Amino acid sequence: MYDIKKWRHIFKLDSAKHISDDDLDAICMSQTDAIMIGGTDDVTEDNVIHLMSRVRRYPLPLVLEISNIESVMPGFDFYFVPTVLNSTDVAFHNGTLLEALKTYGHSIDFEEVIFEGYVVCNADSKVAKHTKANTDLTTEDLEAYAQMVNHMYRLPVMYIEYSGIYGDVSKVQAVSEHLTETQLFYGGGISSEQQATEMAAIADTIIVGDIIYKDIKKALKTVKIKESSK
């Protein structure tokens, strides 16, 4: 079993987006710690299994971040289950999880399931609109969510998600200072080695996604953060 606590860098692939064989090879051979397959819309069983079969040729951990029950399938090393803490819709807190457990609970290996305390911060993002997230958050709000995740819910991961834009470094820093046990994931807008380095100095793990589809060379440079330690 892989130890996610050791992961500093994850490439996140969108199952609904095209990626060439050459670019996928470069991503999977880049020394990233893991590949995560996710997405917000058009996530289907067919496109997830197609992308999974392409990535499975490479010897690195493969994660499915669950966005709907229909696309869940065996074959992944981990299943990351988001609970969107700032969503106004209970379905994104535990409703989807409830349905998944009713359907698959008898066959789940819970050692493979990682619960993520998500906080969505970009009001204009697809994920914010889809999850009906309240993104008007102060630093104090984020600190309270961090305490909730770390001390009360005791979740293994807190994911600060800016999805499409580069986040407020001071707010991410404030969250980090309140997490003593929970692993901090940061994702959103990382499009350069400099940004990757800046966020990797604060978060335990950075998630790099959109830039893969815009500029593969810039995406690959973000892996250089592994050459330094937090």
UniProtKB/Swiss-Prot annotation:
GO terms of biological process kind:
glycerophospholipid biosynthetic process
GO MF terms here are:
heptaprenylglyceryl phosphate synthase activity; magnesium ion binding
Substrates-to-products reaction catalysed: sn-glycerol 1-phosphate + all-trans-heptaprenyl diphosphate = 3-heptaprenyl-sn-glycero-1-phosphate + diphosphate
The broad enzyme category this protein falls into is: transferase
Which sequence ranges are marked TM in the entry?
Answer: none
- Family matches, as Pfam families: PcrB (PF01884)
Instruction: Give the metabolic or biological pathway.
Output: Membrane lipid metabolism; glycerophospholipid metabolism
EC number of the protein: 2.5.1.n9
**What is the designated name of this protein?**
Heptaprenylglyceryl phosphate synthase
Organism (species) = Staphylococcus aureus (strain bovine RF122 / ET3-1)
Q: Which gene encodes it?
A: pcrB
